[in-house]
Amino acid sequence: MGCGLLAAGLLLFTWLPAGCLSLLVTVQHTERYVTLFASVTLKCDYTTSAQLQDVVVTWRFKSFCKDPIFDYFSASYQAALSLGQDPSNDCSDNQREVRIVAQRRGQSEPVLGVDYRQRKITIQNRADLVINEVMWWDHGVYYCTIEAPGDTSGDPDKEVKLIVLHWLTVIFIILGALLLLLLIGVCWCQCCPQYCCCYIRCPCCPTRCCCPEEALARHRYMKQVQALGPQMMEKPLYWGADRSSQVSSYAMNPLLQRDLSLQSSLPQMPMTQMAAHPPVANGVLEYLEKELRNLNPAQPLPADLRAKSGHPCSMLSSLGSAEVVERRVIHLPPLIRDPPSSRTSNPSHQQRLNAVSSRHCDLSERPRQRHHSDFLRELQDQGMRPWAPGRGELDPHWSGRHHRSRPSESSMPWSDWDSLSECPSSSEAPWPPRRPEPREGAQRRERRRHRSYSPPLPSGPSSWSSEEEKESLPRNWGAQRRHHHRRRRSQSPNWPEEKPPSYRSLDVTPGKNNRKKGNVERRLERESSHSGRSVVI
Protein backbone atom coordinates (compact mmCIF):
# COMPACT_ATOMS: atom_id res chain seq x y z
CA MET A 1 0.00 0.00 0.00
CA GLY A 2 2.89 2.38 0.66
CA CYS A 3 4.31 1.78 -2.79
CA GLY A 4 1.02 2.72 -4.40
CA LEU A 5 0.88 6.05 -2.66
CA LEU A 6 4.41 6.86 -3.69
CA ALA A 7 3.70 6.21 -7.34
CA ALA A 8 0.60 8.47 -7.30
CA GLY A 9 2.54 11.34 -5.74
CA LEU A 10 5.29 11.06 -8.31
CA LEU A 11 2.80 11.18 -11.17
CA LEU A 12 1.16 14.31 -9.81
CA PHE A 13 4.49 16.05 -9.40
CA THR A 14 5.47 15.40 -12.98
CA TRP A 15 2.13 16.63 -14.39
CA LEU A 16 2.04 20.02 -12.70
CA PRO A 17 5.23 21.48 -14.31
CA ALA A 18 4.16 20.27 -17.69
CA GLY A 19 0.83 22.12 -17.49
CA CYS A 20 2.41 25.34 -16.29
CA LEU A 21 5.13 25.41 -19.02
CA SER A 22 2.84 25.06 -22.11
CA LEU A 23 3.32 27.35 -25.29
CA LEU A 24 1.30 30.60 -25.54
CA VAL A 25 1.30 32.99 -28.63
CA THR A 26 -0.24 36.51 -28.52
CA VAL A 27 -0.68 39.36 -31.12
CA GLN A 28 -1.30 43.08 -30.46
CA HIS A 29 -3.65 43.83 -33.45
CA THR A 30 -5.76 41.37 -35.37
CA GLU A 31 -6.32 43.83 -38.28
CA ARG A 32 -4.03 46.39 -39.85
CA TYR A 33 -4.81 48.89 -42.60
CA VAL A 34 -2.00 50.21 -44.70
CA THR A 35 -1.62 52.07 -47.99
CA LEU A 36 0.45 51.04 -50.92
CA PHE A 37 4.23 51.54 -50.65
CA ALA A 38 3.98 52.15 -46.93
CA SER A 39 5.82 50.33 -44.10
CA VAL A 40 4.06 48.18 -41.51
CA THR A 41 5.07 46.14 -38.41
CA LEU A 42 3.01 43.12 -37.33
CA LYS A 43 3.45 42.56 -33.55
CA CYS A 44 3.74 38.97 -32.26
CA ASP A 45 4.94 37.56 -28.90
CA TYR A 46 5.09 34.15 -27.28
CA THR A 47 5.86 32.37 -23.99
CA THR A 48 7.45 28.90 -23.76
CA SER A 49 9.38 26.72 -21.38
CA ALA A 50 11.92 25.77 -23.99
CA GLN A 51 15.22 27.47 -24.59
CA LEU A 52 15.12 30.59 -26.87
CA GLN A 53 17.82 29.30 -29.18
CA ASP A 54 15.64 26.31 -29.86
CA VAL A 55 12.45 28.28 -30.67
CA VAL A 56 11.57 28.62 -34.37
CA VAL A 57 9.44 31.64 -35.46
CA THR A 58 7.62 31.36 -38.82
CA TRP A 59 5.41 33.96 -40.65
CA ARG A 60 3.06 32.58 -43.27
CA PHE A 61 0.89 34.47 -45.75
CA LYS A 62 -2.59 33.34 -46.80
CA SER A 63 -4.74 35.31 -49.21
CA PHE A 64 -8.30 36.30 -48.34
CA CYS A 65 -11.10 33.97 -49.19
CA LYS A 66 -13.26 37.00 -49.93
CA ASP A 67 -11.95 40.52 -50.13
CA PRO A 68 -13.09 42.45 -47.05
CA ILE A 69 -13.21 45.71 -49.11
CA PHE A 70 -14.64 44.88 -52.53
CA ASP A 71 -16.82 41.92 -51.40
CA TYR A 72 -18.05 43.44 -48.19
CA PHE A 73 -21.41 44.53 -49.63
CA SER A 74 -22.06 41.24 -51.43
CA ALA A 75 -24.95 39.00 -50.32
CA SER A 76 -22.74 36.00 -49.49
CA TYR A 77 -20.42 38.07 -47.36
CA GLN A 78 -23.27 39.63 -45.45
CA ALA A 79 -24.89 36.16 -45.00
CA ALA A 80 -21.68 34.72 -43.53
CA LEU A 81 -21.40 37.66 -41.17
CA SER A 82 -24.98 37.11 -40.03
CA LEU A 83 -24.11 33.45 -39.17
CA GLY A 84 -21.11 34.54 -37.09
CA GLN A 85 -18.53 33.38 -39.60
CA ASP A 86 -15.55 35.18 -41.10
CA PRO A 87 -16.00 35.00 -44.88
CA SER A 88 -12.55 36.53 -45.52
CA ASN A 89 -10.72 33.73 -43.69
CA ASP A 90 -13.19 30.85 -43.43
CA CYS A 91 -12.00 28.55 -46.20
CA SER A 92 -9.51 25.79 -46.74
CA ASP A 93 -5.94 26.36 -47.84
CA ASN A 94 -6.68 24.73 -51.19
CA GLN A 95 -8.93 27.69 -52.14
CA ARG A 96 -6.36 30.38 -51.51
CA GLU A 97 -2.68 31.12 -51.90
CA VAL A 98 -0.26 30.21 -49.08
CA ARG A 99 3.37 31.49 -48.89
CA ILE A 100 6.13 31.51 -46.29
CA VAL A 101 7.27 35.07 -45.71
CA ALA A 102 10.15 34.69 -43.25
CA GLN A 103 11.55 32.19 -40.74
CA ARG A 104 14.09 32.52 -37.89
CA ARG A 105 15.59 30.13 -35.39
CA GLY A 106 16.63 31.55 -32.05
CA GLN A 107 18.58 34.86 -32.50
CA SER A 108 19.94 34.09 -35.96
CA GLU A 109 19.21 36.04 -39.15
CA PRO A 110 15.75 35.48 -40.67
CA VAL A 111 15.43 33.60 -43.89
CA LEU A 112 13.01 35.02 -46.45
CA GLY A 113 10.72 32.93 -48.56
CA VAL A 114 11.14 32.31 -52.24
CA ASP A 115 8.65 35.03 -53.23
CA TYR A 116 10.08 37.63 -50.81
CA ARG A 117 13.83 37.41 -51.29
CA GLN A 118 14.00 40.71 -53.19
CA ARG A 119 11.83 42.47 -50.62
CA LYS A 120 12.79 44.53 -47.59
CA ILE A 121 11.31 42.24 -44.92
CA THR A 122 12.78 41.21 -41.55
CA ILE A 123 11.88 39.82 -38.08
CA GLN A 124 12.63 42.04 -35.10
CA ASN A 125 12.50 41.55 -31.31
CA ARG A 126 11.01 38.21 -30.39
CA ALA A 127 8.65 37.62 -33.34
CA ASP A 128 7.69 41.03 -34.91
CA LEU A 129 7.40 41.06 -38.73
CA VAL A 130 8.50 44.31 -40.43
CA ILE A 131 7.50 44.91 -44.09
CA ASN A 132 8.92 47.93 -45.93
CA GLU A 133 7.19 49.17 -49.10
CA VAL A 134 3.99 47.19 -48.94
CA MET A 135 2.85 46.01 -52.36
CA TRP A 136 -0.66 45.40 -53.55
CA TRP A 137 -0.22 41.55 -53.40
CA ASP A 138 0.64 41.77 -49.66
CA HIS A 139 -3.08 42.11 -49.07
CA GLY A 140 -4.06 38.97 -46.95
CA VAL A 141 -3.86 37.09 -43.63
CA TYR A 142 -0.51 36.62 -41.83
CA TYR A 143 -0.03 33.76 -39.32
CA CYS A 144 2.58 33.92 -36.57
CA THR A 145 3.59 30.33 -35.70
CA ILE A 146 5.93 29.38 -32.80
CA GLU A 147 7.61 25.98 -32.59
CA ALA A 148 9.24 25.14 -29.22
CA PRO A 149 10.68 21.64 -28.50
CA GLY A 150 9.02 20.01 -25.49
CA ASP A 151 5.91 22.27 -25.58
CA THR A 152 3.16 20.19 -27.04
CA SER A 153 0.22 21.98 -25.51
CA GLY A 154 -1.23 25.46 -26.01
CA ASP A 155 -2.02 27.64 -29.10
CA PRO A 156 1.09 27.73 -31.29
CA ASP A 157 -0.17 30.30 -33.88
CA LYS A 158 -2.12 33.58 -34.17
CA GLU A 159 -3.44 35.45 -37.25
CA VAL A 160 -3.23 39.11 -38.29
CA LYS A 161 -5.22 40.57 -41.19
CA LEU A 162 -3.25 43.02 -43.33
CA ILE A 163 -5.60 45.06 -45.53
CA VAL A 164 -3.67 46.97 -48.22
CA LEU A 165 -5.64 49.95 -49.53
CA HIS A 166 -4.25 49.74 -53.03
CA TRP A 167 -7.46 51.13 -54.53
CA LEU A 168 -7.10 54.20 -52.30
CA THR A 169 -3.57 54.57 -53.50
CA VAL A 170 -4.78 54.45 -57.07
CA ILE A 171 -7.31 57.12 -56.27
CA PHE A 172 -4.59 59.19 -54.67
CA ILE A 173 -2.47 58.77 -57.78
CA ILE A 174 -5.34 59.92 -59.97
CA LEU A 175 -6.01 62.89 -57.74
CA GLY A 176 -2.33 63.74 -57.71
CA ALA A 177 -2.26 63.66 -61.49
CA LEU A 178 -5.26 65.95 -61.58
CA LEU A 179 -3.59 68.29 -59.15
CA LEU A 180 -0.47 68.25 -61.28
CA LEU A 181 -2.49 69.13 -64.35
CA LEU A 182 -4.20 71.87 -62.39
CA LEU A 183 -0.83 73.20 -61.27
CA ILE A 184 0.43 73.18 -64.85
CA GLY A 185 -2.74 74.95 -65.92
CA VAL A 186 -2.28 77.60 -63.25
CA CYS A 187 1.30 78.16 -64.35
CA TRP A 188 0.17 78.29 -67.99
CA CYS A 189 -2.50 80.84 -67.17
CA GLN A 190 -0.11 82.90 -65.10
CA CYS A 191 2.52 83.11 -67.85
CA CYS A 192 0.19 83.11 -70.88
CA PRO A 193 -2.85 85.23 -69.98
CA GLN A 194 -3.95 85.51 -73.62
CA TYR A 195 -5.49 82.02 -73.40
CA CYS A 196 -7.23 82.18 -70.00
CA CYS A 197 -7.75 84.47 -67.04
CA CYS A 198 -6.07 83.17 -63.86
CA TYR A 199 -5.05 85.49 -61.06
CA ILE A 200 -3.16 82.92 -58.93
CA ARG A 201 0.56 83.51 -58.61
CA CYS A 202 2.54 80.43 -59.53
CA PRO A 203 6.18 79.97 -58.43
CA CYS A 204 6.91 77.39 -61.11
CA CYS A 205 7.42 79.93 -63.91
CA PRO A 206 8.48 83.35 -62.62
CA THR A 207 10.16 84.40 -65.87
CA ARG A 208 9.55 81.71 -68.48
CA CYS A 209 6.85 79.13 -69.03
CA CYS A 210 5.83 76.38 -71.40
CA CYS A 211 3.72 78.59 -73.65
CA PRO A 212 5.09 79.60 -77.10
CA GLU A 213 7.36 82.63 -77.17
CA GLU A 214 5.59 83.96 -80.28
CA ALA A 215 2.23 83.98 -78.53
CA LEU A 216 3.69 85.70 -75.48
CA ALA A 217 5.37 88.41 -77.60
CA ARG A 218 2.20 88.88 -79.58
CA HIS A 219 0.21 89.33 -76.39
CA ARG A 220 2.61 92.00 -75.16
CA TYR A 221 2.40 93.79 -78.51
CA MET A 222 -1.40 93.75 -78.38
CA LYS A 223 -1.26 95.31 -74.93
CA GLN A 224 0.87 98.13 -76.33
CA VAL A 225 -1.54 98.58 -79.24
CA GLN A 226 -4.47 98.80 -76.84
CA ALA A 227 -2.62 101.42 -74.79
CA LEU A 228 -1.79 103.52 -77.89
CA GLY A 229 -5.12 102.93 -79.64
CA PRO A 230 -7.05 105.97 -78.28
CA GLN A 231 -4.13 108.30 -79.03
CA MET A 232 -3.90 107.08 -82.63
CA MET A 233 -7.63 107.58 -83.21
CA GLU A 234 -7.81 111.18 -81.95
CA LYS A 235 -6.94 112.77 -85.32
CA PRO A 236 -7.41 111.28 -88.82
CA LEU A 237 -4.52 110.25 -91.01
CA TYR A 238 -4.30 111.33 -94.65
CA TRP A 239 -3.01 109.37 -97.59
CA GLY A 240 -0.62 110.74 -100.16
CA ALA A 241 3.05 111.41 -100.77
CA ASP A 242 5.06 113.67 -98.54
CA ARG A 243 5.41 117.36 -99.16
CA SER A 244 9.05 117.39 -100.14
CA SER A 245 8.66 114.67 -102.76
CA GLN A 246 5.64 116.39 -104.33
CA VAL A 247 7.32 119.79 -104.51
CA SER A 248 10.60 118.43 -105.85
CA SER A 249 8.92 116.28 -108.50
CA TYR A 250 6.73 119.19 -109.56
CA ALA A 251 9.68 121.56 -109.87
CA MET A 252 11.87 119.12 -111.78
CA ASN A 253 9.23 117.86 -114.19
CA PRO A 254 6.76 120.46 -115.55
CA LEU A 255 4.75 117.69 -117.21
CA LEU A 256 3.44 116.77 -113.78
CA GLN A 257 1.80 120.17 -113.33
CA ARG A 258 -1.50 119.08 -114.83
CA ASP A 259 -1.64 115.91 -112.72
CA LEU A 260 -0.75 117.82 -109.58
CA SER A 261 -3.43 120.41 -110.29
CA LEU A 262 -6.02 117.67 -110.69
CA GLN A 263 -4.90 116.01 -107.46
CA SER A 264 -4.94 119.26 -105.52
CA SER A 265 -8.47 120.06 -106.74
CA LEU A 266 -9.82 116.83 -105.20
CA PRO A 267 -10.19 116.58 -101.40
CA GLN A 268 -7.96 114.02 -99.79
CA MET A 269 -9.56 111.08 -98.04
CA PRO A 270 -8.77 110.66 -94.35
CA MET A 271 -8.35 107.23 -92.94
CA THR A 272 -11.59 105.66 -91.82
CA GLN A 273 -11.58 105.53 -88.06
CA MET A 274 -12.42 102.30 -86.37
CA ALA A 275 -16.02 102.24 -85.26
CA ALA A 276 -15.35 100.32 -82.06
CA HIS A 277 -12.66 98.26 -80.46
CA PRO A 278 -12.93 94.53 -81.09
CA PRO A 279 -14.52 92.58 -78.27
CA VAL A 280 -11.70 90.04 -78.13
CA ALA A 281 -8.37 91.36 -76.84
CA ASN A 282 -6.21 89.10 -78.97
CA GLY A 283 -7.89 90.21 -82.22
CA VAL A 284 -6.85 93.87 -82.17
CA LEU A 285 -3.93 93.36 -84.53
CA GLU A 286 -6.01 91.34 -86.98
CA TYR A 287 -8.74 93.97 -86.84
CA LEU A 288 -6.29 96.77 -87.70
CA GLU A 289 -4.84 94.79 -90.60
CA LYS A 290 -8.33 94.07 -91.91
CA GLU A 291 -9.27 97.74 -91.75
CA LEU A 292 -6.12 98.74 -93.63
CA ARG A 293 -6.77 96.13 -96.33
CA ASN A 294 -10.38 97.22 -96.76
CA LEU A 295 -9.49 100.91 -96.87
CA ASN A 296 -10.38 102.58 -100.18
CA PRO A 297 -8.90 106.10 -100.55
CA ALA A 298 -11.12 106.79 -103.58
CA GLN A 299 -14.44 106.45 -101.74
CA PRO A 300 -16.20 109.72 -100.77
CA LEU A 301 -15.86 111.17 -97.32
CA PRO A 302 -18.76 110.38 -94.92
CA ALA A 303 -21.10 113.18 -93.97
CA ASP A 304 -20.11 113.31 -90.32
CA LEU A 305 -16.39 113.39 -91.07
CA ARG A 306 -16.97 116.00 -93.77
CA ALA A 307 -18.73 118.22 -91.27
CA LYS A 308 -15.91 117.85 -88.76
CA SER A 309 -13.07 118.34 -91.19
CA GLY A 310 -14.36 121.68 -92.60
CA HIS A 311 -12.57 122.61 -95.80
CA PRO A 312 -10.88 119.78 -97.70
CA CYS A 313 -7.15 119.46 -97.33
CA SER A 314 -4.95 119.51 -100.40
CA MET A 315 -2.06 117.20 -101.19
CA LEU A 316 0.47 119.56 -99.63
CA SER A 317 -1.45 121.01 -96.70
CA SER A 318 -2.74 117.66 -95.45
CA LEU A 319 0.70 116.16 -94.89
CA GLY A 320 2.94 119.10 -94.16
CA SER A 321 3.42 120.64 -90.74
CA ALA A 322 2.81 124.17 -92.05
CA GLU A 323 -0.68 125.51 -91.45
CA VAL A 324 -0.77 127.93 -94.40
CA VAL A 325 -0.06 126.66 -97.90
CA GLU A 326 -0.31 128.95 -100.92
CA ARG A 327 -1.52 127.90 -104.36
CA ARG A 328 -1.32 130.26 -107.33
CA VAL A 329 -3.10 129.83 -110.65
CA ILE A 330 -1.80 131.90 -113.55
CA HIS A 331 -3.98 132.22 -116.65
CA LEU A 332 -2.21 133.13 -119.87
CA PRO A 333 -3.99 134.87 -122.76
CA PRO A 334 -4.81 132.97 -125.93
CA LEU A 335 -2.48 133.02 -128.90
CA ILE A 336 -5.06 133.78 -131.62
CA ARG A 337 -4.67 135.89 -134.73
CA ASP A 338 -8.28 135.73 -135.91
CA PRO A 339 -10.84 138.48 -135.31
CA PRO A 340 -13.22 138.23 -132.32
CA SER A 341 -16.11 137.02 -134.42
CA SER A 342 -14.28 133.88 -135.48
CA ARG A 343 -13.09 133.38 -131.94
CA THR A 344 -16.57 133.16 -130.51
CA SER A 345 -18.07 131.26 -133.41
CA ASN A 346 -16.07 128.05 -133.41
CA PRO A 347 -14.34 126.92 -130.18
CA SER A 348 -12.82 123.82 -131.75
CA HIS A 349 -11.22 125.89 -134.50
CA GLN A 350 -9.89 128.21 -131.82
CA GLN A 351 -8.21 125.33 -129.98
CA ARG A 352 -6.54 124.04 -133.13
CA LEU A 353 -5.37 127.54 -133.97
CA ASN A 354 -3.93 128.04 -130.49
CA ALA A 355 -2.02 124.77 -130.68
CA VAL A 356 -0.48 125.63 -134.10
CA SER A 357 0.47 129.16 -133.14
CA SER A 358 1.95 128.18 -129.78
CA ARG A 359 4.01 125.43 -131.39
CA HIS A 360 5.43 127.83 -133.98
CA CYS A 361 6.08 130.49 -131.39
CA ASP A 362 8.09 128.12 -129.23
CA LEU A 363 10.34 127.31 -132.19
CA SER A 364 10.96 130.93 -133.13
CA GLU A 365 11.07 132.40 -129.63
CA ARG A 366 14.83 132.83 -129.34
CA PRO A 367 15.42 134.56 -132.76
CA ARG A 368 12.55 136.96 -132.10
CA GLN A 369 13.89 137.96 -128.70
CA ARG A 370 17.35 138.62 -130.16
CA HIS A 371 15.96 140.80 -133.01
CA HIS A 372 13.70 142.67 -130.65
CA SER A 373 16.57 143.53 -128.29
CA ASP A 374 18.63 144.82 -131.27
CA PHE A 375 15.68 146.91 -132.39
CA LEU A 376 15.24 148.56 -129.00
CA ARG A 377 18.95 149.28 -128.71
CA GLU A 378 18.94 150.94 -132.14
CA LEU A 379 15.84 152.92 -131.27
CA GLN A 380 17.44 154.28 -128.10
CA ASP A 381 20.64 155.21 -129.96
CA GLN A 382 18.67 157.29 -132.44
CA GLY A 383 16.79 159.07 -129.65
CA MET A 384 13.36 158.26 -131.07
CA ARG A 385 10.38 158.26 -128.67
CA PRO A 386 6.95 156.94 -129.50
CA TRP A 387 5.21 159.36 -127.11
CA ALA A 388 4.72 163.03 -127.39
CA PRO A 389 6.57 164.97 -124.70
CA GLY A 390 4.53 166.25 -121.81
CA ARG A 391 1.41 164.28 -122.68
CA GLY A 392 0.06 160.84 -121.86
CA GLU A 393 -1.03 160.00 -125.43
CA LEU A 394 0.76 158.60 -128.42
CA ASP A 395 2.54 160.82 -130.86
CA PRO A 396 0.43 161.38 -133.98
CA HIS A 397 3.50 160.78 -136.13
CA TRP A 398 3.85 157.39 -134.56
CA SER A 399 0.15 156.65 -134.68
CA GLY A 400 0.06 156.94 -138.44
CA ARG A 401 -2.32 155.22 -140.69
CA HIS A 402 -2.28 151.93 -138.96
CA HIS A 403 -4.33 153.14 -136.02
CA ARG A 404 -6.97 154.57 -138.32
CA SER A 405 -6.94 151.59 -140.60
CA ARG A 406 -8.00 149.21 -137.75
CA PRO A 407 -10.25 151.28 -135.52
CA SER A 408 -12.87 148.56 -135.13
CA GLU A 409 -10.57 145.87 -133.83
CA SER A 410 -11.48 144.91 -130.26
CA SER A 411 -8.92 144.91 -127.53
CA MET A 412 -7.62 141.56 -126.48
CA PRO A 413 -5.48 140.48 -123.53
CA TRP A 414 -1.81 141.18 -123.78
CA SER A 415 0.34 138.22 -124.68
CA ASP A 416 3.98 137.76 -125.49
CA TRP A 417 5.81 140.69 -127.17
CA ASP A 418 6.04 139.14 -130.61
CA SER A 419 3.45 136.37 -130.42
CA LEU A 420 0.65 138.29 -132.21
CA SER A 421 2.60 139.66 -135.09
CA GLU A 422 5.47 137.35 -135.89
CA CYS A 423 3.90 133.90 -135.31
CA PRO A 424 2.37 132.71 -138.60
CA SER A 425 -0.50 130.26 -138.85
CA SER A 426 -0.28 126.80 -140.27
CA SER A 427 -1.19 128.01 -143.76
CA GLU A 428 1.52 130.67 -143.93
CA ALA A 429 5.10 129.89 -144.78
CA PRO A 430 7.83 131.00 -142.35
CA TRP A 431 10.12 133.83 -143.41
CA PRO A 432 13.71 134.55 -142.41
CA PRO A 433 14.11 137.05 -139.60
CA ARG A 434 15.07 140.57 -140.52
CA ARG A 435 15.87 143.70 -138.57
CA PRO A 436 12.85 146.00 -138.69
CA GLU A 437 13.09 149.64 -139.52
CA PRO A 438 12.56 152.21 -136.80
CA ARG A 439 9.28 153.42 -138.24
CA GLU A 440 7.96 149.89 -138.73
CA GLY A 441 8.89 149.00 -135.17
CA ALA A 442 7.12 152.10 -133.85
CA GLN A 443 3.98 151.31 -135.84
CA ARG A 444 3.97 147.72 -134.65
CA ARG A 445 4.38 148.80 -131.06
CA GLU A 446 1.60 151.37 -131.46
CA ARG A 447 -0.66 148.62 -132.82
CA ARG A 448 0.10 146.43 -129.85
CA ARG A 449 -0.57 149.28 -127.42
CA HIS A 450 -3.95 149.79 -129.01
CA ARG A 451 -4.83 146.13 -128.56
CA SER A 452 -3.72 145.75 -124.97
CA TYR A 453 -4.29 147.80 -121.89
CA SER A 454 -1.34 146.36 -120.06
CA PRO A 455 1.17 148.88 -118.75
CA PRO A 456 4.92 148.36 -118.84
CA LEU A 457 6.38 145.95 -116.36
CA PRO A 458 6.86 147.61 -112.98
CA SER A 459 10.12 147.62 -111.20
CA GLY A 460 8.60 146.31 -107.96
CA PRO A 461 7.45 142.80 -107.25
CA SER A 462 5.37 141.07 -109.88
CA SER A 463 1.58 140.99 -109.82
CA TRP A 464 1.50 137.30 -109.09
CA SER A 465 3.81 137.35 -106.08
CA SER A 466 2.54 135.74 -102.91
CA GLU A 467 1.38 137.47 -99.76
CA GLU A 468 4.47 136.27 -97.91
CA GLU A 469 6.74 138.04 -100.43
CA LYS A 470 4.75 141.24 -100.00
CA GLU A 471 4.95 141.03 -96.25
CA SER A 472 8.71 140.43 -96.37
CA LEU A 473 9.26 143.81 -98.10
CA PRO A 474 10.19 146.83 -95.97
CA ARG A 475 7.47 149.08 -94.63
CA ASN A 476 8.51 152.15 -96.63
CA TRP A 477 8.36 150.17 -99.86
CA GLY A 478 4.93 151.62 -100.68
CA ALA A 479 6.19 155.18 -100.53
CA GLN A 480 9.22 154.33 -102.62
CA ARG A 481 6.98 152.64 -105.17
CA ARG A 482 4.61 155.66 -105.41
CA HIS A 483 7.59 157.97 -105.85
CA HIS A 484 8.96 155.68 -108.53
CA HIS A 485 5.61 155.64 -110.35
CA ARG A 486 5.41 159.45 -110.31
CA ARG A 487 8.85 159.62 -111.90
CA ARG A 488 7.84 157.08 -114.55
CA ARG A 489 4.51 158.86 -115.16
CA SER A 490 6.35 162.08 -115.94
CA GLN A 491 8.37 160.23 -118.57
CA SER A 492 5.63 157.89 -119.88
CA PRO A 493 2.09 158.52 -121.18
CA ASN A 494 -0.92 158.36 -118.88
CA TRP A 495 -2.54 154.98 -119.10
CA PRO A 496 -6.31 154.58 -118.82
CA GLU A 497 -7.98 154.00 -115.47
CA GLU A 498 -9.04 150.44 -116.18
CA LYS A 499 -6.01 148.47 -117.24
CA PRO A 500 -6.66 144.82 -116.41
CA PRO A 501 -3.43 142.86 -116.22
CA SER A 502 -3.05 139.97 -118.52
CA TYR A 503 -1.59 137.72 -115.84
CA ARG A 504 -3.82 136.89 -112.93
CA SER A 505 -2.70 135.19 -109.76
CA LEU A 506 -5.05 133.45 -107.40
CA ASP A 507 -3.68 133.22 -103.90
CA VAL A 508 -5.51 130.60 -101.92
CA THR A 509 -4.57 131.10 -98.29
CA PRO A 510 -6.96 129.70 -95.71
CA GLY A 511 -7.98 132.15 -93.06
CA LYS A 512 -6.72 135.60 -94.06
CA ASN A 513 -7.44 136.00 -97.81
CA ASN A 514 -11.08 134.95 -97.88
CA ARG A 515 -12.39 138.41 -98.80
CA LYS A 516 -9.80 139.02 -101.47
CA LYS A 517 -10.32 135.60 -102.94
CA GLY A 518 -13.95 136.28 -103.86
CA ASN A 519 -13.26 139.34 -106.06
CA VAL A 520 -10.29 137.71 -107.72
CA GLU A 521 -12.19 134.51 -108.46
CA ARG A 522 -15.13 136.43 -110.03
CA ARG A 523 -12.81 138.40 -112.27
CA LEU A 524 -10.94 135.22 -113.10
CA GLU A 525 -14.13 133.41 -114.12
CA ARG A 526 -15.09 136.25 -116.50
CA GLU A 527 -11.72 136.07 -118.22
CA SER A 528 -11.34 132.29 -118.15
CA SER A 529 -13.10 131.94 -121.52
CA HIS A 530 -10.35 134.02 -123.18
CA SER A 531 -7.41 132.22 -121.58
CA GLY A 532 -5.51 129.67 -123.53
CA ARG A 533 -3.21 128.13 -120.93
CA SER A 534 -3.27 127.71 -117.16
CA VAL A 535 -0.32 126.99 -114.96
CA VAL A 536 -0.64 125.94 -111.31
CA ILE A 537 2.26 126.81 -108.99
UniProtKB/Swiss-Prot annotation:
> What processes in GO biological process is this protein linked to?
cellular response to leukemia inhibitory factor; epithelial structure maintenance; establishment of localization in cell; peptide hormone secretion; positive regulation of peptide hormone secretion; protein localization to tricellular tight junction; regulation of RNA splicing; response to fatty acid
State the residue spans of region: Disordered: 333-537
Q: Where is the composition biased (Polar residues)?
A: 341-357
Q: Cytoplasmic topology: which positions?
A: 188-537
Keywords attached to this Swiss-Prot or TrEMBL record, sorted alphabetically, are:
Cell junction, Cell membrane, Cytoplasm, Disulfide bond, Immunoglobulin domain, Membrane, Nucleus, Phosphoprotein, Receptor, Signal, Tight junction, Transmembrane, Transmembrane helix
Cysteine pairs forming cystine bridges in this chain are C44-C144
Knockout mutant characteristics:
Mutant mice have early-onset severe deafness associated with a rapid degeneration of cochlear hair cells but have a normal endocochlear potential. Mutants show no increase in plasma CCK levels after orogastric gavage with fatty acids.
Q: Name one GO molecular function term.
A: identical protein binding
For the keyword Signal, the answer is: yes
List all Basic and acidic residues biased stretches. Answer: 359-380, 434-444, 518-530
PROSITE patterns membership = IG_LIKE
Q: What is its main location?
A: membrane
Which topology term describes how it sits in the membrane? Single-pass type I membrane protein
Amino acid composition bias (Basic residues), ranges on this chain: 480-490
The record's similarity note reads: Belongs to the immunoglobulin superfamily. LISCH7 family.
Q: How does it assemble?
A: Homooligomer. Interacts with MARVELD2 and OCLN; the interaction is required to recruit MARVELD2 to tricellular contacts. Interacts (via C-terminus) with TRA2A, TRA2B and SRSF1. Interacts with PLSCR1.
Name of the protein this chain belongs to: Immunoglobulin-like domain-containing receptor 1
| Species whose genome carries this gene | Mus musculus
Lineage at the top is: Eukaryota, Metazoa, Chordata, Craniata, Vertebrata
